[in-house]
């Protein structure tokens, strides 16, 4: 039985493409949450903010999730836009002998 606090800081910058907006459009994201491993079953509770953006960034987002026994981060951009993504994810883990 484990609880893991995570904080994900992500930056997306448009570097090309023919869709609306322009090269250099950007958006930043901070997502925080807790993943619980309860007897081998993972669950996640999280919230996300976007502290800064410029240009056309509608629909862009990182998504932190769990699948099976894995923590995942996927990203979603927009049609006809080339976007580069960088992310730092910090995790703090607490293992306990009690049932969560």
Tell me what each language-model feature is.
Residues 70, 84-86, 96-100:
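Domain-scale recognition of soluble eukaryotic interaction modules
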Residues 1, 66, 78-80:
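Surface-exposed coil/turn segments at beta-strand junctions on protein surfaces, enriched
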Residues 76-80, 88-95:
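Mixed-charge, glycine-accented linear interaction segment located at domain edges/termini
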Residues 65-75:
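Noncatalytic modules at the cell exterior or secretory-pathway interfaces
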Residues 37-55, 90-100:
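Glycine-rich, low-complexity segments
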Residues 34-36, 58-66:
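Short, exposed beta-strand/loop patches in secreted or surface proteins that constitute
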Residues 1-35, 84-92:
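Beta-rich globular "head" domains
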Residues 48-52, 74-81:
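Secondary-structure transition/turn motif
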């Amino acid at each position: 039985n484990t609880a893991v606090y995570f904080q994900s800081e992500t930056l997306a910058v448009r570097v090309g493409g023919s869709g609306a907006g322009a090269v250099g459009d950007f958006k930043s994201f901070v997502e925080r949450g807790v993943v619980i491993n309860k007897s081998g079953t993972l669950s996640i509770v999280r919230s996300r903010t976007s502290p800064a953006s410029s240009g056309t960034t509608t629909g862009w987002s990182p998504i932190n999730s769990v699948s099976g026994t894995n923590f995942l981060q996927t990203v979603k951009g927009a049609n006809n836009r080339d976007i580069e993504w960088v992310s730092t994810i910090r995790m703090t883990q607490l293992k306990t002998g009690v049932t969560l």
